[in-house]
Amino acid sequence: MPNVSDIISSFLQSEIARGSLPGAQYLVGEDLRIIAEDALGLAVVEPEHIPATLDTIYDLASLTKPLVTALLVVRFAERGVLDLNAPLARYLVEFNDKDKREITLIQLMTHSSGLPNWRPLYLEAQTRADVPAAIARTLLEPQPPHGQREVIYSDLNYVLLGFVLERVTGERLDRLAEREIFEPLGLERTMFSPPELLREIAATEHGQEFELANAIADAETRSWGDTASFAASPYRRAVVSQAKWRKDVIWGEVHDGNANFMGGVAGHAGLFSTAREAFRMANQFLPGSELLKPESLHLFTGNLTPGCRTSRSIAWILAETPDCSAGPALPPTALGHNGFTGTSIWMDPHKRRVFVLLTNRVHPRVGAIDMREIRRRFNALAVETVSGF
C-alpha cells in the first residue's frame, strides 16, 4: 500500500525536476493530527547544495500577517487594549490628517484601507521609526463612489498594524510574538531575525533584482509620468545605485526589502518557521484555539468585505474569491494566505483541516512560474490524501 504522502511528494518532486522550485516542505493535518508530511529537493542551491529536511526553516514572508500580526491585534482587542473599529490615528498620530483620518484598524486588517499595495519604504524613510510617517505621506488609491472601500491587498496595512502593536505595548513586535505566541505554543524553530542557524535555513533570492525592478517601476509611475523622463533623471540613478540593495544570496535574513530595512522585524513579513510549527500556529484560528477566545474566531472565518470582488476576513482570503490559490477542491468557506517566497497555508475550518506548503521558489532567482497553479494542485492532492486516510 503506498504511503499517504506519495501523491503529494510525487507532484512536488515533478515540479522540482521542472525547475519550478528548488525544494519544498509540506504538511497535511486534520484535527491537530499530522496526516502527511515530507521534505524534498534542496533548501540551498547557491552557494552550495543543502538538502531540505523537515527541520529546515523557511522565510514565511506574508504569512507573518495572519500568524503573528493579526493574531496579536485580536488578542489585544480581547483585552480591551485595542479597538478594531477605532481610527488608526488614535494609535499612530501620523495619520491624524485629512484623507487618512477615517482609516480604521479593521480596514487595515481586511485590506480595505485604500493604501496602495507596496512602496519601497527603505527609499522613503531614514530609519525604522520614520516608516509610519513615510506611509502617511502616501496617496490613497482611487475608490468607488458608493462609499465602501474596495479591497487592495497591501503590505503597508500590516506594516502599520505592527507599529500599532509596538506603540500600545512599548515592546518590539518580535518580543511580543515570542511572549504571546511562540512560548505559549512551545515553538522552538519559529522566530524573527534568525540567530546563527544559517545551514538550517532555506535560502531565497540572489540579490534583490526583482524588488529593484519594482522600485524603478514604482518611481516611474508616481514621480515622472513617462518612462523616458524618469530614465534620464538623477532620481533613477539614485534608486539604481542605492547602497541598501543586497547583491548576494539572501540566506539567513528576511527576503522582503522593507522588512529587512526595519531590522527583520515587521508586521507584514519577517517570520521564519517550519511546516510543523506553522501548522501549530494555523490551528489557533480554528475551534479549540489555545490563544483566541471562541467568540473571536468568526473575525477570521467570516466575510468582512461583502460586496467587494475579494472576500476577506481578518488577514485571510476566503476560497469563495474567484481565481484565488485555494482551487476548486476546497469549500468556499476555506481560508488561506500566500507568501511571496513560495509559501501558503489553507484551512477548512469546518473539518479542521490545515494544509501547509513551504517553498523557496525565489531561490536563486525569481522565475516565471505559475505558483498559483502549484498551490491549487497541492491543495487538491491534500484533500485527496486526508479524505482517504
Where are these regions (language model features)?
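Generic C-terminus detector
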Residues: 362-389
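Active-site SXXK
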Residues: 6-13, 32, 59-85, 161-166, ...
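Short, glycine/proline-biased beta-turn/loop segments that scaffold the active-site neighborhood
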Residues: 83-98, 183-185
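Short, well-ordered beta-strand elements
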Residues: 345-346, 352-360, 365
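Short loop/turn microsegments at loop-to-beta-strand junctions
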Residues: 22-24, 341-344
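Short, P/G- and charge-enriched loop/turn segments at secondary-structure junctions
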Residues: 13-15, 57, 147-148, 330-335, ...
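Short, conserved catalytic-motif segment at the N-terminal edge
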Residues: 2-60, 81-83, 368, 372
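Short, surface-exposed loop or secondary-structure junction motifs
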Residues: 98-332
